[in-house]
Regions:
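Conserved ABC ATPase signature
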Residues: 19-23, 27
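Helix N-cap at the start of a conserved alpha-helix in ABC-type nucleotide-binding domains
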Residues: 55-57
Length: 132
């Protein structure tokens, strides 16, 4: 029963009886998140959770993380290389370059200069903010 509740929390209860290999990449990612939620964690560590997803699905998965963080008070720690998603969906950002922390603070306060330092001038963040 908890498994079905976890699938419902991530919006894919209707896929409960579908084989995982028949699900889209985004749906598979949500199954992974549901499996994690089923364990009642206090923290979720996610390594590149949107790396192979299309932009729409990536935003949907990021929204799932934000909602889970806020509704269930679960800390979410993401390793993500999509700067625009990190800035739009995360409260805090830690920017690392060559093993050294370049920035550690609110996503809303990171500057282009700091992003350039992290990415050697290749980062081009979006200015659009999400409604989280």
């Amino acid at each position: 029963m908890r498994a079905l509740e976890s699938l419902d929390k991530v919006g894919i209860l209707d896929k409960a009886y579908t084989r995982c290999d028949q699900l889209s990449g985004g749906q598979q990612q949500r199954v992974a998140l549901a499996r994690t939620l089923n364990q009642n964690p206090s923290i979720i560590l996610a390594d590149e959770p949107v790396a192979s997803l299309d932009p729409v699905t990536a935003r949907q998965v990021m929204s799932d993380f934000v909602r889970i963080n806020k509704e269930y008070k679960i800390t979410i720690l993401l390793n993500i290389h999509h700067v625009d998603l990190a800035l739009n969906y995360c409260d805090s950002v830690i920017g690392v370059r060559a093993g050294e922390i370049v920035f550690d603070g609110p996503a809303s306060s990171i500057t282009q200069e700091q992003l350039d330092e992290v990415y050697n001038g290749t980062a081009v963040p979006t200015t659009e903010k999400s409604d989280n």
